[in-house]
A protein has these predicted regions:
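N-terminal cap/lid segment of alpha/beta-hydrolase-fold proteins
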Residues: 1-38
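Gly/Ser-rich "nucleophile elbow"/oxyanion-hole loop immediately N-terminal to the catalytic nucleophile
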Residues: 33, 92-119
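Short beta-strand element of the alpha/beta-hydrolase
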Residues: 36-46, 114
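Conserved alpha/beta-hydrolase
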Residues: 42, 60-79
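Serine-hydrolase catalytic-loop signature spanning alpha/beta hydrolases and amidase-signature enzymes
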Residues: 46-49, 70
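Catalytic nucleophile-loop/oxyanion-hole region of alpha/beta-hydrolase
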Residues: 74-94, 100, 107
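Short glycine-enriched nucleophile-adjacent loop
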Residues: 122-137
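A catalytic-pocket lid/entrance helix-loop region that shapes and gates access to the active site
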Residues: 134-183
Length: 183
């Protein structure tokens, strides 16, 4: 598989496989100096269109350069479907060794599997490590850690707290709550 334009990962020392499993596109990348750890990346909201793609977040290059394997799924459909994101990402994590073997690279099972994502992907990463998902998912993965980067992973109480803090800060600073004319 050819490198994307501007990609700075050394493709001569990194195995890179892409395909479709269960209706979801995927990409898996494993450096020659693999440290035995796998990071699953979950992308953000992509609208409702039919095109299913795997993104190249900036953290990907850093992880591969540090010896981590990296994998990501497009999910089997677009929309704000956290469950589909969890299931498709977990299915890909479980297929990691099978994909490597099918491409001629025999690897030990990952010693640790992590999950991270941005925006809706952060919501998916957070949901993937919750007890409910671990108990009820069709594709069960027990992640060793998660870094969900998403503002909507809090509930309404959290947002009400943020709103109250904002209003209090504006009152203390003497800034009108609404409308704000000078940013």
């Amino acid at each position: 598989m050819a490198a994307d334009a501007g990609d700075t990962v050394d493709m001569s020392t990194t195995s890179r496989w892409a395909g479709v499993r269960g209706g979801a596109a995927y990409r898996v990348e494993v450096p020659a100096n693999w440290n035995g750890k796998l990071v699953m990346y979950t992308h953000g909201y992509r609208g409702t269109g039919a095109a299913l793609t795997v993104s190249n977040p900036s953290i990907r290059r850093h992880l591969i350069q540090q010896g981590y394997a990296w994998a990501a799924s497009s999910y089997s459909r677009n929309y704000y479907d956290v469950r589909a994101g969890v299931e498709d990402t977990n299915a890909l994590a479980l297929a990691f060794n099978e994909i490597a073997a099918a491409n001629g690279r025999s690897l030990a099972a990952p010693s640790k599997i992590y999950i991270t994502g941005h925006s809706m992907g952060g919501h998916i990463a957070a949901a993937a490590v919750e007890a409910e998902a671990i108990a009820n998912a069709r594709n069960k993965v027990r992640y060793h850690g998660a870094v969900p980067m998403c503002g909507v992973t809090g509930d309404m109480e959290l947002f009400n707290t943020f709103q109250a803090m904002q209003v209090a800060a504006q009152a203390i600073a003497g800034v009108p709550a609404y409308p704000v004319t000078r940013w």
